[in-house]
Amino acid sequence: MREPGFWYRPPSLLSSLLRPLGAIYGAVAAHRMAQPGTAVGVPVLCIGNFHGGGAGKTPTALALARLLLELGERPVVLSRGYGGRLHGPVSVDPGRHGAADVGDEPLMMARDIPVVVARDRVAGAALARSRGASVILMDDGFQNPAVAKDAALIVIDGDRGLGNGYVIPAGPLRAPLPPQLARTDALIVVGRGRAADPVAAAVKDNGGLLLRARFLPAEASLAALCDRPVLAFAGIGDPARFFATLRTAGINVAAERVFADHHPYAKQDLAGLTEIAGRDGFTLVTTEKDLARLRSDPAHAAFARSVVPFAVTLEFDDAKALRDFVIEKLTQARDKHRRAGRS
């Protein structure tokens, strides 16, 4: 599903007409967020968004996983597995599972870190613990109360911010902002844009940590695309950001094709892309997430080999502040668990 364009424009007649529905949706979401979660025995760090759509949760999860490994932890990612058919809990095996089974994001992350997919988050956390997790990284699920969270790190795009600030379906917010701010421990602003400044100020006023980060392209991707006109395509939450990242890196984006988030590519989609690339001499480039979907389908394997993945990592402006924050939250969580165990 593609997000409506009016979400990220000034309030309009349509968004105003939808605000009563947003008020109902928001009231339900806020009530749900207030419910107590189940403690799962190990620290839980949740990476989420205030809004629907993409903002960089997956690169953030991978960056946090690398930090946790440096700290001697054994992180396991817990994901709902959006777009996959398996309800779980199941440990993701890239050699056995495809995107249609577990979703594209878990499949991509499972190349680097253990990932558990589960619609039932508590059951998924139990499986993660059985796999030796010393820390659970919850990928999304900020608004889901099932599992008690020891820290919530919210990711936001600095260029887009929160759009019109309304709740779904009138705007992009998954719940009213005040109850979300109250549960936010850190805000990660990705990119140099200033659209997120108001919410960043609100998080700081609430005592939360503000972190800024940016995407860094992998050298291999830059080398493969240097001096070539490319046809860039993506089926992610914010394809415009992907295209902008390519251009910022100096890539000659000659053409773009946008698909819905988590789009299951069909034969005709790939035939159309191949025809344009062949006719105009373009190199095909897409996101790692899209390529994970393509590679996992045997029918699309040949096409996937013709596509260059544009790999990125997330670099924090103040890596020490993030490290200190994580260490503090892990220490607090373990102290709390010990006290609960003695009571």
Curated annotation (Swiss-Prot):
MF GO annotations: ATP binding; tetraacyldisaccharide 4'-kinase activity
GO biological process: lipid A biosynthetic process; lipopolysaccharide core region biosynthetic process
Record flagged with keyword Transferase: yes
Any one Pfam family match given in the protein's UniProt record, by short name: LpxK
Residues reported in the UniProt entry to bind ATP: H51, G52, G53, G54, A55, G56, K57, T58
Catalytic activity, EC: 2.7.1.130
Keywords, alphabetical: ATP-binding, Kinase, Lipid A biosynthesis, Lipid biosynthesis, Lipid metabolism, Nucleotide-binding, Transferase
InterPro entries: LpxK, P-loop_NTPase
GO cellular component, one term: plasma membrane
Catalyzed chemical reaction(s): a lipid A disaccharide + ATP = a lipid IVA + ADP + H(+)
Transmembrane segments: none
Keyword hit for Phosphoprotein: no
Enzyme superclass (EC): transferase
First and last residue of the signal peptide: none
Pathway: Glycolipid biosynthesis; lipid IV(A) biosynthesis; lipid IV(A) from (3R)-3-hydroxytetradecanoyl-[acyl-carrier-protein] and UDP-N-acetyl-alpha-D-glucosamine: step 6/6
Annotated family: Belongs to the LpxK family.
Role according to the record: Transfers the gamma-phosphate of ATP to the 4'-position of a tetraacyldisaccharide 1-phosphate intermediate (termed DS-1-P) to form tetraacyldisaccharide 1,4'-bis-phosphate (lipid IVA).
Stated name of the protein: Tetraacyldisaccharide 4'-kinase
Top-level taxonomy: Bacteria, Pseudomonadati, Pseudomonadota, Alphaproteobacteria, Hyphomicrobiales
Protein's gene: lpxK
